[in-house]
Amino acid sequence: HDAKCSAVSLGKDEKTGDNLFTKTKRKPGYTYQYEAVGKALQLGWNKDNIGSHIVRNNIIHDCGQNGIVGHLGCVFSEIYGNEIFRIATKHEFFGYEIAGIKFHAAIDTQIHHNYIHDCTLAIWLDWETQGTRVSCNLFTDNIRDLMVEVSHGPYLVDNNIFTSPYSFENASQGGAYVHNLVLGNMKRWNELNRSTPYHFPHT
């Protein structure tokens, strides 16, 4: 708790690139994302030696940027039984990594049975939400509950309870939203100007 930035990081190896868009501004951010995937594969990134973390039964609160964050390193992981609250509510940071749970490339990651409340954004899944399942979570009193951005799927959002005034934003393709209780607004749009990298299924 009370981490200035992140409580738990399931990050990626710095050798695949670290914040290159901000440092160089030579090309769009999604191009660096493509390159990070390619570099990771060249460095031996695979299911046998990356990811497969379990983050369970934690109370994570009062963090400045995010509660749990991951980029490629969060693949094949399971996040469950956590209570996450008051994340980014002091507005110390602005940007694209603000959420209770913020994952890039959450390939085959399971996020279930968490209670996420009183956050700026509860869960933000970005780039390569592929084989991901968000299931049986309770969202209350967030500014936004869920955002899925620039992903091709497939991913599943099922049996969640979304009670915040703004339930979710979907700027992706390939998602199935099934058996959720949705009490707030929803927004859906196509984001076709940024291509998404992908891995072969379950790799």
Language-model features, listed with the residues they occupy:
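Glycine- and acidic/polar-rich repeat regions and solenoidal domains
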Residues: 3-203
